[in-house]
A protein has these predicted regions:
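PLP-dependent amino-acid enzyme catalytic core
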Residues: 1-343
């Protein structure tokens, strides 16, 4: 290999052996933490930058400005360092100090937004700041992971190919910008239309419909629905709260040796919902990132206590999984009009 960028992708799939997986069924985990910055956003960032360079929207040696909750900023910063680009990442107080230092290690400039929008979220405030910075840096490029069609297009054309090597009934992922799950789903369904797709989101997010309310998880959810969230790509949906997602993270770390981020815990729980509440025999779940980003939050008991997070044990999770009916979204129907699985 001639560049760190060539190490992006080809992440492993492991079968989860845990008592929470129903007997006779299989849960496979696609571990995107094996990308160089430990998240699926390495793929997204690479796809957006390559497309921009090809189209001329980004000049060699130019400037990239993007809003990020954590992972995409790391990916863009690394790519900028490798390709000689200036990178400015716009973040908010939910970002960890580790992530900020990560950006700076690659030479990126960090711009912090401290005031939330009227709904209590930071995404819109970050985007407004991006617009200001674009005026201050003429010729700069905004990848706009939320609405840029090159986001799902890259995952459709490239990432989805890695999901064709295994037989499974349902693909499970999470939504924020919607780009990776929409693109992967589209690529898979083109060749294997029988595969169903479950879109998971955090309770409080408005990405799949409904009103926004603040939540703790990073890297999942949005205060609105982005253009890259294509509802027609999804067959099922599930809304999962912070407590269940974080509990899943802690259990998988302690009992399976899997140190996962909050969005991955959310997806793992959603995948189990599918196995418990549907006829699916095998599920492939996309684990977006590593827990290394969250050692001082999700994996810190004092932080959880301060945030009033209740951790469920294995048996409590099993009872919830057995008690809840799994609902299917009708094809072509807006998910916000379909009752969701909420906890």
């Amino acid at each position: 290999m001639k560049s760190i960028l060539e190490t992006i992708g080809s992440c492993p799939i492991v079968e989860l052996s845990h008592s929470l997986v129903p007997s006779g069924k299989k849960l496979y985990l696609k571990l995107e933490q094996f990308n160089p910055n430990h998240s699926i956003k390495d793929r997204t960032a690479l796809g957006l930058v390559l497309a921009a360079l090809k189209s001329g929207h980004l000049a060699p040696g130019g400037t990239v400005i993007e809003s990020t909750s954590g992972n995409l900023g790391k990916s863009l910063a690394m790519i900028g360092a490798a390709m000689g680009l200036k990178v400015i990442v716009v973040v908010d107080p939910k970002v960890s100090s580790t992530a900020v230092n990560w950006y700076k290690a690659y030479g990126a400039q960090v711009d912090m937004v401290n005031t939330p929008d009227g709904q209590g979220g930071y995404q819109r405030a970050r985007i407004e700041r991006v617009q200001q910075l674009l005026h201050e840096h003429p010729g700069a490029y905004w990848p706009n992971q939320y609405d840029n069609p090159q986001n799902p297009a890259y995952h459709d054309e490239v990432t989805a190919k890695e999901f064709a090597r295994l037989d499974y009934d349902v693909l499970v992922g999470c939504v924020s910008t919607g780009g990776h799950l929409s693109g992967i789903a589209r690529g898979i369904k083109r060749d294997r239309p029988q595969v169903k797709v479950l879109a998971c989101d955090v309770l409080g997010s408005a990405a799949l419909g409904g009103a926004f309310s603040p939540y703790l998880l990073n890297g999942v959810g949005l205060a609105w629905r982005s253009a890259n969230t294509h509802l027609d790509c999804f067959d099922y949906h599930s809304l999962i709260d912070d407590h269940h997602a974080i509990s899943m993270c802690r259990i998988l770390a302690r009992e399976s040796g899997l140190l996962l981020g909050g969005s991955a815990g959310l997806v793992a729980y959603g995948a189990l919902q599918c196995l418990y509440g549907s006829s699916a025999k095998s599920v492939l779940a996309i684990m977006p990132d590593s827990g290394t980003n969250y050692l001082d939050t999700l994996y810190d008991d004092r932080w959880l206590e301060q945030k009033n997070i209740h951790l469920y044990g294995v048996e409590a999770l099993r009872q919830d999984l057995q008690a809840n009916e799994f609902k299917r979204s009708r094809s072509g129907r807006d998910l916000e009009s379909v009752p969701s699985l909420s906890y």
